[in-house]
UniProtKB/Swiss-Prot annotation:
Record GO terms (molecular function): aminoacyl-tRNA deacylase activity; ATP binding; leucine-tRNA ligase activity
Higher taxonomy: Bacteria, Pseudomonadati, Pseudomonadota, Gammaproteobacteria, Vibrionales
Compartments it resides in: Cytoplasm
Lineage top rank: taxon: Bacteria
Keywords carried by this UniProt record: Aminoacyl-tRNA synthetase, ATP-binding, Cytoplasm, Ligase, Nucleotide-binding, Protein biosynthesis
Biological process according to GO: leucyl-tRNA aminoacylation
Pfam family, one: tRNA-synt_1_2
Protein name: Leucine--tRNA ligase
Residues spanning the signal sequence: none
Designated gene of the protein: leuS
Catalytic activities: tRNA(Leu) + L-leucine + ATP = L-leucyl-tRNA(Leu) + AMP + diphosphate
Species for this entry: Photobacterium profundum (strain SS9)
EC number in record: 6.1.1.4
Motif stretch ('HIGH' region): 42-52
Annotated family: Belongs to the class-I aminoacyl-tRNA synthetase family.
Residue numbers covered by motif 'KMSKS' region: 618-622
Length: 858
């Protein structure tokens, strides 16, 4: 073992050892308990960022800890390789997406290896290869044959200038990002998978996910959005078909004063056909894409269609308005409006001078006032005819029953969740395996003709997908008849919805090998960002249930335990230029002055300009405040970067990047290395004789085993990695001060250092590997996690604090089994106690067993 800790000398050597010995390559072993640890796989954007490093370090720490518990641990890695950024980069760099993607994979793979992550590289795959997406295509055709896939027209963002479909992220302020043309909404046929068929099960099974953060489960519950309500019909004057609406508040039915419909509703389209003003308004609504979250705050706009709806119970006629807050994608595309009891309806009614009729009053008898805002609480009905006096649930049931009896409505369960639209009008994705024959019939591509391969040698013009532009590519046959291929590709969430399962058998000649999949699944620990709570995590749960129902897996859920790591923040600095826009300056190009409390007082960039500090914000390219992991590894070594990542903050909280903190982690590792080097240089160590230890030696050994117990619990159960590292640091402070004179001093230090090195191994595997060998052991990768000796925690002596009139005046060392009388006697005889009690009369002596003697005197 070299005297100085120089990571650059050891890390590559240890990584080569892992590669040569295939240390992390695993197979199914029915005799060992398995542990499947997975971090969300990266998109190969070109370089790793600190968010990646944090995510993968957490996963690696958990994996290595579980290995040392004797488990058969699988930790795979791969590449989520399809997606829009590759198309954009290809246009910019005048290349095709495929070579750009594969080059990035090679570069990032090398970065992951330099960080020392213990991956089973034999399981690696990229989702953009036919070997992967072929099985996705086949599974899709199976779902189609089961009736779980369908095609319907749906709205997309359309650029009329480029004649192309835009992804949501390509629409900037309602305009095309490329040519600044106002974007329109266009309806085109798209493919959907019936996730709604599984809505109730997806909701119910959240209750089985005890290892998931409550916040993520709540987000999914809200996203699925189960509600119980009533579906009812309003007759429309002059129309044959009634207007269907869904409401969760049938108790307010007698307060309906208008009906709102979406711009895309058939009634709106029919009315607009003969009304130019209404047509212009519906077009405006259609081309203003509104997120559901914005509905509450946006300006409410509407226009009377001239149509009248007939109230299903009292026969009153109410106007039908096209309203911009009603979305065609939700419910029936129509809402019954009760301004007195819904704030959105209230604002709209106030704006357009519509009636506001209250029908619910507070249950407590307090005065009802709807002069300034709606009364939205549940209460008691009035002015509602036969339903007067009923409270919410009774009114709900009675009104639903009456509607049902008259054939005008029924109780129903509704979900906010919509079927999963998987069509994308992009090139760089897996082709959807469907064909259309000349008679207009749609068919799945037969299994023996899969995969439908995406051509990789293409030219990107930045406007049209190459497979849409190449008319020859789409030409094929079906049962000998001419046919055209589907030129849309899958939503890239398709690939990431089942990748975790493919790792179990990446070479299988089917989507999965059930035997291998059922050995490894479900994933025991999943690590990734909370931003994936409602899309990726929900789609993966859905896909798992589809795989189960197809007979591939036996478990109901894909991920047992979920850890959502916090974001990585860094200082951000900007300079406001002559045009008044902010130029973001990299923190590495800024010299800062701090005040006594460490706050930034002044910041000067490398051009000598004073720049503004914008605070600690998420590392991003746009704010130019990302720190390159490569630079940090080159400067400090992978182990130091990993240690800082795990120590600087709880794993699920934001982490503030401070290079001073990285320097602190480096100093700590050097101290551990130095002590191990000094200890091993003194030669062989005799066996530890626990029975012969002195009082001080026993106390130190107690600290060692208390630390083992705490670190085991912090990493294994609580996942508070930062407190585990803090406990190891605290122990190291004691070991650095411990005597090394006697043979048993050295034997005790040997036991302690071996425990420290193994406990640090999940965070700092390279340094631990070297120190473990120096301590005379072989291959830390197959070592066993230290077990704490319960007997070491038994104390022969206890320290009792003596308080006199609330002030600490003495400390007593007493036998662990000393009685209350013995402690009181020793306390009153203590020379410090005698000094402070001189001239006072003792009024009370209170003993808190094993801790405190409290004397009250005056």
């Amino acid at each position: 073992m070299q005297e100085q800790y120089r990571p650059q000398d050891i890390e590559q050597k240890v990584q080569e050892h892992w590669d040569n010995n295939k240390t992390f390559v695993v197979n199914e072993d029915p005799n060992k308990e398995k542990f499947y640890c997975l971090s969300m796989f990266p998109y190969p954007s070109g370089r790793l960022h600190m968010g990646h490093v944090r995510n993968y370090t957490i996963g690696d720490v958990v994996s290595r800890y579980q290995r040392l518990q004797g488990k058969n641990v699988m930790q795979p890695i791969g590449w989520d390789a399809f997606g829009l950024p590759a198309e954009n980069a290809a246009v910019k760099n005048k290349t095709a997406p495929a070579p750009w993607t594969y080059e990035n994979i090679e570069y990032m793979k090398n970065q992951l290896k330099l960080l020392g992550f213990g991956y089973d590289w034999s399981r690696e795959f990229a989702t953009c290869t036919p070997e992967y997406y072929r099985w996705e295509q086949e599974f899709f055709t199976k779902l189609y044959n089961k009736g779980l896939v369908y095609k319907k027209t749906s709205s997309v963002n359309w650029c009329p200038n480029d004649q192309t479909v835009l992804a949501n992220e390509q629409v900037e302020d309602g305009c095309c990002w490329r040519c600044d043309t106002p974007v329109e909404q266009k309806k085109i046929p798209q493919w959907f998978i019936k996730i709604t068929e599984y809505a109730q099960e997806l909701l119910d099974d959240l209750d089985t996910l005890d290892g998931w953060p409550e916040m993520v489960k709540t987000m999914q519950r809200n996203w699925i959005g189960r509600s119980e309500g009533v579906e009812l019909s309003f007759a429309v004057n002059g129309e044959e078909a009634p207007l269907e609406v869904y409401t969760t508040r049938p108790d307010t039915l007698m307060g309906v004063t208008y009906v709102g419909i979406a711009a895309g509703h058939p009634l709106a389209e029919k009315a607009a056909a003969t009304n130019p003003e209404l047509f212009a308004f519906t077009e405006e609504c259609r081309n203003t894409k509104v997120a559901e979250a914005e509905l509450a705050t946006m300006e409410k706009k509407g226009m009377d269609t001239g149509l009248r709806a007939v109230h299903p119970l009292n026969g009153r006629e109410v106007p039908i308005y096209v309203a911009n807050f009603v979305l065609m994608d939700y419910g029936t595309g129509a809402v019954m409006a009760v301004p007195a009891h819904d704030q959105r309806d209230y604002e709209f009614a106030t704006k357009y001078g519509l009636d506001i009729i209250p029908v619910i009053k507070p249950e407590d008898g307090s005065e009802l006032n709807v002069s300034e805002e709606a009364y939205t609480e549940k209460g008691v009905l009035f002015d509602s005819g036969e339903f007067d006096g009923l409270a919410f649930q009774d009114a709900f049931d009675a009104i639903a029953a009456k509607l049902e009896a008259e054939g005008k409505g029924k109780k129903t369960v509704n979900f906010r969740l919509r079927d999963w639209g998987v069509s994308r009008q992009r090139y760089w994705g897996a082709p959807i395996p469907m064909v259309t024959t000349e008679d207009g019939e749609v068919h799945p591509v037969p299994a023996d003709q899969l995969p439908v391969i995406l051509p990789e040698n293409v030219v990107m013009d930045g406007v049209t997908s190459p497979i849409k532009a190449d008319k020859e590519w789409a030409k094929t046959t079906f049962n000998g008849e001419p046919a055209l291929r589907e030129t849309d590709t899958f939503d890239t969430f398709m690939e990431s919805s089942w990748y975790y399962a493919r790792y179990c058998s990446p070479q299988a000649d089917d989507i999965l090998d059930p035997e291998k999949a059922n050995y490894w699944l479900p994933v025991d620990q999943y690590v990734g960002g909370i931003e994936h709570a409602c899309m990726h995590l929900l789609y993966s749960r859905f896909f798992h249930k589809l795989l189960r129902d197809a007979g591939y897996v036996t478990s109901n859920e894909p991920f047992k335990q979920l850890l959502c790591q916090g974001m990585v923040l860094a200082d951000a600095f900007h300079h406001t230029n002559e045009k008044g826009t902010k130029e973001w300056i990299a923190p590495t190009d800024v010299t800062i002055e701090r005040d006594a409390k460490g706050r930034i007082e002044k910041a000067i960039d490398d051009q000598g300009r004073e720049v503004q500090h914008s605070g600690m914000i998420k590392m991003s390219k746009s704010k130019n405040n990302g720190i390159d992991p490569q630079e940090m590894v080159d400067k400090f070594g992978a182990d130091t970067v990993r240690l800082f990542m795990m120590f600087a903050s709880p794993a699920d909280m934001t982490l503030e990047w401070q290079e001073s903190g990285v320097e602190g982690a480096s100093r700590f590792l050097k101290r551990v290395w130095k002590l191990v080097h000094e200890h091993t240089n003194k030669g062989t160590v005799e066996a530890l004789d626990v029975a012969a230890l002195s009082g001080n030696q026993k106390a130190l050994r107690r600290d060692v085993h208390k630390t083992i117990a705490k670190v085991s619990d912090d990493i294994g159960r609580r996942q508070t990695f930062n407190t585990a590292i803090a406990a190891i640091m605290e122990l190291m402070n004691k070991l650095n001060k411990a005597p090394q004179e006697s043979a048993q001093d050295r034997a005790l230090l040997d036991e302690a250092l071996k425990a420290v090195v193994v406990m640090l191994y999940p965070m700092t595997p390279h340094a631990s590997f070297e120190m473990w060998e120096a301590l005379g052991e072989t291959d830390i990768d197959t070592a066993t996690w230290p077990t704490f000796d319960k007997n070491a925690l038994i104390e022969d002596e206890k320290t009792i604090v003596v308080m006199i009139n609330g002030k600490l005046r003495a400390k007593l060392i007493v036998a662990a089994d000393a009685t209350e009388e013995q402690v009181k006697e020793l306390g009153l005889k203590d020379e410090n106690a005698i000094k402070f009690l001189d001239g006072l009369t003792i009024r009370k002596v209170i003993y808190v067993p094993g801790k405190l003697l409290n004397i009250v005197a005056n």
